[in-house]
Amino acid sequence: MAEEPQTVLQLPPSSAAGGEGLTDVSPETTTPEPPSSAAVSPGTEEPAGDTKKKIDILLKAVGDTPIMKTKKWAVERTRTIQGPIDFIKKFLKLVASEQLFIYVNQSFAPSPDQEVGTLYECFGSDGKLVLHYCKSQAWG
């Protein structure tokens, strides 16, 4: 089975006002390698092991929520879950009044201030963190 293209999710600095500045870096194909040495972005050298700076997240739609064509993204390990939530809302062009629910491994909703790196260490598998997103409450 062919590997899915991966895109680096560039989130603005935490101090940026208005949440603007999200950019989408062109996708690159990944090769089947051990998770600790998987490439994240062009020209980026990562330390071996669990100390890599970016975490691969796999975004899966639930229910009637629109499916994103690019499902695999790379996010800095120090980012909070609120960053990907804001990005998904903007990417799906959701109105400010619409809610977006994020679930880790179809089981629980992490708090918006939870760091992606911590979630990956506890619940990541196969070198990525699986996040399910939906517009209505699905689990827990």
Curated annotation (Swiss-Prot):
Keyword Membrane part of the UniProt annotation: yes
Localization (cell): Cytoplasm; Preautophagosomal structure membrane
The UniProt record lists the keyword Metal-binding: no
Bias type Low complexity, positions: 25-42
Protein name, as recorded: Ubiquitin-like protein ATG12
UniProt record, GO biological process: autophagosome assembly; autophagosome maturation; autophagy of mitochondrion; glycophagy; innate immune response; piecemeal microautophagy of the nucleus
Keywords attached to this entry: Acetylation, Autophagy, Cytoplasm, Immunity, Innate immunity, Isopeptide bond, Membrane, Ubl conjugation pathway
Annotated organism of origin: Pongo abelii
Main subcellular localisation: cytoplasm
Subunit annotation: Forms a conjugate with ATG5. Part of the minor complex composed of 4 sets of ATG12-ATG5 and ATG16L1 (400 kDa); this complex interacts with ATG3 leading to disruption of ATG7 interaction and promotion of ATG8-like proteins lipidation. Forms an 800-kDa complex composed of ATG12-ATG5 and ATG16L2. Interacts with DHX58/RIG-1, IFIH1/MDA5 and MAVS/IPS-1 in monomeric form as well as in ATG12-ATG5 conjugate. The interaction with MAVS is further enhanced upon vesicular stomatitis virus (VSV) infection.
SUPFAM superfamilies in the cross-refs: Ubiquitin-like (SSF54236)
A Pfam family that the UniProt record links to this protein: APG12
Topology of this chain in the membrane: Peripheral membrane protein
Annotated Gene3D superfamilies: Phosphatidylinositol 3-kinase Catalytic Subunit, Chain A, domain 1
Protein function: Ubiquitin-like protein involved in autophagy vesicles formation. Conjugation with ATG5 through a ubiquitin-like conjugating system involving also ATG7 as an E1-like activating enzyme and ATG10 as an E2-like conjugating enzyme, is essential for its function. The ATG12-ATG5 conjugate acts as an E3-like enzyme which is required for lipidation of ATG8 family proteins and their association to the vesicle membranes. The ATG12-ATG5 conjugate also negatively regulates the innate antiviral immune response by blocking the type I IFN production pathway through direct association with RARRES3 and MAVS.
